[in-house]
Regions:
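Glyoxalase I/VOC metalloenzyme domain signal
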Residues: 2-41, 45-188
Length: 188
């Protein structure tokens, strides 16, 4: 299968990767977040139009396999396992999250967030994630924190999220990897 960066339908997100990598690294620095020892298991996109999501899907189907397709928070989300990774900082992501547009509008179409796995009790996720971030970083103008518990129709694992954003890119923390969540769906 082809490398994702050579697929015509994915040309815009290939070109967007350096911007995302720079913005993510800058956000981590602002937050005092040492990303080196952390396991990030997937990367996610955002788009404004269904036609963009459909084009990206066609592209990912040429360079990976569909792991999961689910309705989460009222919109379709596909997960693809790529044959060649998306490289950001020291990470090599083989899983890409492709959500269709929802009610929220994002400032940029392209790469939007990474998801870091902090194994442990779901009830302690927020405290464990916040302990990795510098207080002075969290107090900076433009930094926002959000907690949520997104859930797919057949998911069996509680999957709370703590997200930290600067409005451009986001770092999300979860207690489970996305592949563990997908496996829990098959137990339904």
């Amino acid at each position: 299968m082809a490398d994702w960066q050579t697929i015509d339908e994915l040309h815009d997100i290939s070109a967007d990767l350096p911007r995302f990598t720079k913005a993510l690294t800058e956000l981590a620095t602002r937050l005092g977040l040492d990303i080196a020892p952390l396991e990030a298991d997937h990367i996610s996109l955002r788009c404004h139009q269904n036609t963009t999501a459909e084009r990206w899907r066609r592209g990912f189907e040429q360079c990976g396999t569909l792991l999961s397709e689910n309705i989460i928070n009222g919109r379709p989300i596909c997960l693809f396992k790529l044959h060649q990774p998306v490289k950001v900082a020291h990470w090599s992501f083989t899983v890409v999250e492709l959500p269709w547009p929802g009610e929220k509008r994002y400032p940029h179409e392209g790469w939007e967030h990474i998801e870091i796995v902090l194994p442990g009790e779901p009830e302690t996720l927020n405290a464990r994630a916040l302990a990795l971030l510098a207080d002075e970083g969290l107090r900076q103008s433009g930094i926002a924190i959000k907690t949520s518990s997104p859930k797919g129709e057949h998911e069996r694992l509680p999957n709370p999220t703590l997200a930290v954003t600067d409005g451009t890119v986001t770092v999300k923390f979860h207690p489970w990897s996305i592949e563990e969540i997908v496996a829990s769906e098959s137990d339904a």
